[in-house]
From Swiss-Prot:
ATP binds at residues 116-123. Pathway: Porphyrin-containing compound metabolism; chlorophyll biosynthesis. It is an enzyme of class 6 (ligase). This is Magnesium-chelatase subunit ChlI, chloroplastic. The keyword ATP-binding applies. Keywords: ATP-binding, Chlorophyll biosynthesis, Chloroplast, Disulfide bond, Ligase, Nucleotide-binding, Photosynthesis, Plastid, Transit peptide.
């Protein structure tokens, strides 16, 4: 999958920090003896709960080789990837593009749900983000893309190594974008324990799933409204808590799984439950372009890309690099962006008067407004910033009224101007 692969480069650190590329990480084993209560053990980058009174067994983490191989091969794999349509070449759909950019700048916004007509470029736009994603530092060979500097994004094993004073091998890699297919099983998403090994060898081998690969990255679900509800629940819980827990055969295994969840779908094929919609930070509505000249331009641009992808991508290289620099700069100044107290009060007043349940709407609107101010290069949020993002932050949180003909986004906009005027 092209979009799930990222390019990597070794950070400039002393050579002693790096292990030989030809050596494979050893597979560690933890023995649990019958009749003993081990409590919570941390091993192999995962948290393991031993259960008192169980027969003797071993827990093996078989994932340690996966990321090291991917990181070593990522530069070569970039050349063989399917060409991605440039983000800056997308015509129109400004609302969707803005929501995606704000989530890249501040992943804590909570993802974005994109709903719209067929053939409006939803999947193309999301996958085109891969070229704009900034590089991040990860611990070499770690299957969970642990952050070597932030304990919040560290696997348990890496955190213990840091506490012991061990120097870590670090690589620079682009943020991953992982596609979740509709036919994926819960084991493929969350990770699986090999029961056959447990029966034949007395070993329980844990193999991380897509949530581990998406840690500190983006997880994209096309046609999310057709995904099984229990899988959507798993994705949203992991995205909100930042951890994935797998319970199998008396063993509880946890690992970091903090990612930006992006879903897209066609409302004609079914809606998400309101309680699930509320868990997405922002909601973008995409419509078919009606302007004839814009439609012609889109067709011509797509034709150019299909004819010669490399030449087409090169023609947008300068715009892509400029946008990537804007994103990197916005991420670096985001923590210094301030929002005045009176603006916070007005945001909450809009939410209250619209009868928005809970406080997620207030929180997300504040975060999105700050991210937009950072993208514009400012350190203070303006009312204009709030007006731009608040429809996308609240429209999917309003209670449905079957007798209401006006779009929920317009209701939010009307209430905003009523309160802020």
């Amino acid at each position: 999958m092209a979009s799930a692969l990222g390019t990597s480069s070794i950070a400039v650190l002393p050579s002693r920090y790096f292990s030989s590329s030809s050596s494979k990480p050893s597979i560690h084993t933890l023995s649990l003896t019958s009749g003993q209560n081990y409590g919570r053990k941390f091993y192999g980058g995962i948290g393991i709960h031993g259960i008192k009174g169980r027969a003797q067994l071993s827990v093996t983490n078989v994932a340690t080789e996966v990321n090291s191989v991917e990181q070593a091969q990522s530069i070569a794999s970039k050349e063989s990837q399917r060409p991605v349509y440039p983000f800056s070449a997308i015509v129109g759909q400004d609302e969707m593009k803005l929501c995606l950019l704000l989530n890249v700048i501040d992943p804590k916004i909570g993802g974005v749900m994109i709903m719209g007509d067929r053939g409006t470029g939803k999947s193309t736009t999301v996958r085109s983000l891969v070229d704009l994603l900034p590089e991040i530092k990860v611990v070499a060979g770690d299957p969970y893309n642990s952050d070597p500097q932030d304990p919040e994004f560290m696997g348990v094993e890496v955190r213990e190594r840091v506490l012991q004073g061990e120097e870590l091998s670090v690589v620079l890699t682009k943020i991953n974008m992982v596609d979740l297919p509709l036919g994926a099983t819960e084991d493929r998403v969350c990770g699986t324990i090999d029961i056959e090994k447990a029966l034949t060898e007395g070993v329980k081998a844990f193999e991380p799933g897509l949530l581990a690969k998406a840690n500190r990255g983006i997880l994209y679900v096309d046609e999310v409204n057709l995904l099984d509800d229990h899988l959507v629940d798993v994705l949203l819980d992991s995205a909100a808590s930042g951890w994935n827990t797998v319970e199998r055969e008396g063993i509880s295994i946890s690992h970091p799984a903090r990612f930006i969840l992006i879903g897209s779908g066609n409302p004609e094929e079914g809606e998400l439950r309101p309680q699930l919609l509320d868990r997405f930070g922002m909601h973008a509505q995409v419509g078919t372009v009606r302007d004839a000249e814009l439609r012609v331009k889109i067709v011509e641009e797509r034709g150019r890309f299909d004819k010669n992808p490399k030449e087409f991508r090169d023609s947008y290289k300068a715009e892509q690099e400029k946008l990537q620099q804007q994103i990197t700069s916005a991420r670096s100044v985001l923590s210094s962006v301030q929002i005045d107290q009176d603006l916070k009060v007005k945001i909450s007043k809009v939410c209250a008067e619209l009868n928005v349940d809970g406080l997620r709407g207030d929180i997300v609107t504040n975060r999105a407004a700050k991210a937009l101010a950072a993208l514009k290069g400012r350190d203070n949020v303006s009312a204009e910033d709030i007006a731009t993002v608040i429809p996308n932050c609240l429209r999917h949180r309003l209670r449905k009224d079957p007798l209401e003909s006006i779009d929920s986004g317009l209701l939010v906009t009307e209430k905003f101007y009523e309160v802020f005027s």
